């Protein structure tokens, strides 16, 4: 099984590293093209494009300016340890064993507006470039047109390397839109996480994001390789609901959190 998740806007380049192993991103030539486009933007344009404050726009203008593709442990960090959003809070990669990192490197991929597809141990320099923004480029009006089929092709390579044809979609809709399901060399399974609120079960964004990380951790730490094993997921109170699930959509429910 190959898991795909979204990146995070929040980054951590200070915490102690849980592993010294690293690899290089595989699509840096494309990243360089995007960086050159982004370097033409003023901080005001970045603020408008990304919907962020002037302070954050200045920070990201500086990141674009300082970015260079010679990644080392001194100027970059492994992606799985650099991202720090809700998904990564659930995953807790800082507690992974060497065997966990090895399994994740084979079975987990992070989608990225700048880097396309990242493996967990791929070094990355800090950036903010969300997949859904309207950044004009030679391929078209946005990043979906820039990446085209390349993200799907990279995932197909990973599926072939890790030995089966099942892709577990734990990414957000914004990011998974960069994948072309019709061109995937495999079948898709999407876990869905419902939380109870006032007696009704629904997707609550904060909880769902963390649950995607929890599911990733569950697969990685238990070294799961078959889709039928996913129904055993039970971290932090979630339980599989067979009645609501379908072949390609696994539904997990949790009672209200107080």
UniProtKB/Swiss-Prot annotation:
Its BP terms in the Gene Ontology are: response to hydroperoxide
UniProt family annotation = Belongs to the UPF0246 family.
Its domain of life reads Bacteria
InterPro entries in the cross-refs: YaaA (IPR005583)
Q: Which species does the entry assign this protein to?
A: Yersinia enterocolitica serotype O:8 / biotype 1B (strain NCTC 13174 / 8081)
Pfam families in the record: H2O2_YaaD
* Record's GO cellular component terms: cytosol
Name of protein: UPF0246 protein YE0603
NCBIfam families in alphabetical order: PRK02101.1-1 (NF002541), PRK02101.1-3 (NF002542)
